Structure formats: C-alpha cells, structure tokens
C-alpha cells in the first residue's frame, strides 16, 4: 500500500507535476524541508531556499492548496503538507562532444513530484501560537520581574568612592628588564676553543 492510496482520516487534496526538469535527488533535498509543515510555512521556506528545485516544488504545493480550496472547500489556513515525494521520471540521454573524437554521455533526469495536503484542525490555542512567540513572551515577563529586583539592591548598596587623582605627577609605565641569555654548554665551549679530544 503506497502513501497515495492510503486512506487518511482528514480531508485531503492531491497535486502532481510530471516530467519536471530537475533530478529526483535534488528535488528530495528540498522536499525534506517542508514535509509535515503547514502550507503557508512550506511556501515561506521554499521562497527563500537557494536550491533551483524549490521553485517547482512550491508550485506543486500551491496547486495542491488551490485544489483543496476549490474542489474540496477546505480552509487554506488549516492545510498541512501531509505527504510529498519525488519519483524518478524518464531520463533523456544527450551527448557532449569532447576532444579527439570522444563523446561523453549527459543524463538529463526528470521527476514526478506528488503533494498531498490535509486539512488538520488546530489542536488548541496554545499549539496554534508558535513556540518562538511563547518564548519571547516568557522572556519579556521574566525581564519585567527581574528588572525590579536589581534596582532595589542597587539602591541599598552605597556607591564606591574613587581615589583622588595625584596632583601634577605623571606616571610612566614600568620598563621591562632585558631578557637574559642562557649560559653556553661546556662541550660547545671546548669545541669552540679548538680542543680536539
């Protein structure tokens, strides 16, 4: 039983793009970024993805969302990319002429991209809000609570007084002593003096 024939419990819509001029391996690299995400998130990710395969994949996801809205009457805000995969299409074989009468084979690979979107209702209000938004709210609340406590401690502590500056005497930095040379070895000195033993 394949993913396309498997019955789902949520209403869904399908879109396919066949004979897309991108290799399946490169298409799968982009597809893995959006599997399981909402349609709006998936399209945002693909809009900024630098891979060339992101264009055709985004087009198929948008088509599946339009199919769900027009044919199934589903709410586009609840659509999730449930299943997405790229199968290998036919490979066109071409020849690249090379030096000395040789010819190299070029394989122009194609893909069949399939997208299934499902209308999944939001679980609750908490899950609808992104985790990033929850973290920022929590940090703002913590900073408000934390900001009042250090202010009280600072007010209780007396400020430290600085030592008065000396009158007119300018300090100069201390000079470093020159490095000492290591003493010469005894065997080297006897050889240098001409002692041959």
Swiss-Prot record:
Residues 118-197 are annotated as: Disordered. Residues 149-165, 184-197 have a biased composition (Low complexity). GO terms for biological process: translation. It comes from the Bacteria. PROSITE patterns: RIBOSOMAL_L22. InterPro entries: Ribosomal_uL22, Ribosomal_uL22_bac/chlpt-type, Ribosomal_uL22_bac/org-type, Ribosomal_uL22_CS, Ribosomal_uL22_sf. The keyword rRNA-binding applies. It holds the Pfam family Ribosomal_L22. GO terms for molecular function: rRNA binding; structural constituent of ribosome. Keywords: Ribonucleoprotein, Ribosomal protein, RNA-binding, rRNA-binding. One of its GO terms (cellular component) is cytosolic large ribosomal subunit. SUPFAM superfamilies: Ribosomal protein L22 (SSF54843). The keyword Glycoprotein does not apply. Residues 172-183 have a biased composition (Basic residues). Belongs to the universal ribosomal protein uL22 family. This protein binds specifically to 23S rRNA; its binding is stimulated by other ribosomal proteins, e.g. L4, L17, and L20. It is important during the early stages of 50S assembly. It makes multiple contacts with different domains of the 23S rRNA in the assembled 50S subunit and ribosome. The globular domain of the protein is located near the polypeptide exit tunnel on the outside of the subunit, while an extended beta-hairpin is found that lines the wall of the exit tunnel in the center of the 70S ribosome. Part of the 50S ribosomal subunit. HAMAP family: Ribosomal_uL22_B. This is Large ribosomal subunit protein uL22. The lineage of its organism: Bacteria, Bacillati, Actinomycetota, Actinomycetes, Mycobacteriales.
């Amino acid at each position: 039983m394949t993913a396309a024939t498997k019955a789902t419990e949520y209403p869904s819509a399908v879109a396919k793009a066949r004979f897309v001029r991108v290799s399946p391996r490169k298409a799968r690299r982009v597809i893995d970024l959006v599997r399981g995400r909402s349609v709006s998130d998936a399209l945002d990710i693909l809009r900024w993805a630098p891979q060339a395969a992101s264009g055709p994949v985004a087009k198929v996801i948008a088509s599946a969302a339009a199919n769900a809205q027009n044919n199934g009457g589903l709410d586009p805000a609840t659509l999730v990319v449930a299943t997405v995969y790229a199968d290998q299409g036919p490979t066109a074989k071409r020849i690249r002429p090379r030096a000395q009468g040789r010819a190299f084979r070029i394989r122009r690979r194609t893909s069949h991209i399939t997208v299934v979107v499902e209308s999944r209702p939001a679980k609750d209000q908490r899950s609808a809000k992104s985790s990033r938004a929850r973290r920022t709210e929590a940090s703002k609340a913590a900073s408000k609570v934390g900001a009042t406590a250090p202010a009280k401690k600072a007010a209780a502590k007396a400020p430290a007084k600085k030592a008065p500056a000396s009158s007119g005497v300018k300090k100069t930095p201390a000079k470093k002593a020159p490095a000492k040379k290591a003493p010469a070895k005894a065997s080297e000195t006897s050889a240098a003096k001409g002692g041959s033993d």
